[in-house]
Structure formats: C-alpha cells, structure tokens
C-alpha cells in the first residue's frame, strides 16, 4: 500500500494561498442548511477568537478543511470536516482526524445525522473507528439562517457521554457560541 503523504494543518485566513479552494470545498461539501453564509464564515476567521479554520495540507497540496470551536475549557466542537473529492477514500480523512485529535489534546464533540440510512451509518462508523462514541442525548441543531428549521441530529464525542447536567451545559455552550441561540 502506498504510504500517505505528510499531513499538516495551516490556519485559514483571508490571505491564505488556498482560501479559494477551501471556500469552494466548504460550499460544495455542505448543503446550505448545514453551513453559515460564506461571507460570514470568511469574516469569522479573523473576528471570532473561539473559531478556528484549518486547511489540511498534504505535501503543500490542499487536501481538506476542519473548522472547530473552543466551546468550554474542557470541550472543543468540530463544526465542519471535509476532504477534497479527489482525495476521498485514500485514508487522508482518518489520518487528518487522528492528527487533529492528538494535537488538540482534549475532549471533542461533533454533530452527525441520525443513523437512519447508509450514509449517516458510514459516517458514524468512520468516527467510531477514530475513537468517538455516539451519545444517547437527544439533540437538535439550531438553524444556521434566520427562519430555518431545527434539525434532529446526534452528538458524538471522543469521550464517554457526560452526565446529564454536564451534557446540558455543553449543549447550551454549543448553541450559544456556535449558533447564537439562547436555550
């Protein structure tokens, strides 16, 4: 099997040489209901101190992106994670996720669609292979846009599901910081 190229993360900023590729991936990998307006996303790269956008690079080639938030002292939240279509199924996503988790050194939570059909089950399986567990906590994602609908999703974490009180605080922090919603 061919060895994977060297992976690095590069903070995305308005002057990043691969910002155009990252923006195109953001807009095509995630439907409009699963992402914020692109202009706002670009602005957040320099104005939101808890928001981090990273280009995934393989030997100086743009391979994907990870956006994440520092929610609490104990938890980070991966909002978006995507690999460019030409590099999918090559193992780069798993290497990138493992590298992110080892460099971040903390608890991470993310949202996934309920396991009602094949694609969400495959996505959940991918995260499980990289140390995440599907939490039983009922969860709804606030809309990214005014007037949008709340989506029934599931949370996964690289730790065991917290006790109910801690879970509620985590969801409240996620909703307030990421979506601007007061529960």
PLM-predicted stretches and their roles:
Residues 111, 124, 128-148:
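Conserved catalytic-core motifs of GNAT/GCN5-like acyltransferases
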Residues 83, 89-103:
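Conserved acetyl-CoA-binding loop-helix of GNAT-fold acetyltransferases
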Residues 104-119:
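Conserved GNAT acetyl-CoA-binding A-motif
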Residues 55, 61-70, 75-82:
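Conserved beta-strand in the GNAT
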Residues 29-58, 62:
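Active-site rim helix/loop that mediates acceptor-substrate recognition in acyltransferases
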Residues 51, 150-155:
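Short hydrophobic/aromatic beta-strand or adjacent loop that forms the aromatic wall/cage
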Residues 55-57, 155-159:
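Short, well-ordered beta-strand micro-motif
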Residues 1-40, 153-155, 166-183:
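Short amphipathic alpha-helix that is part of the acyltransferase structural core
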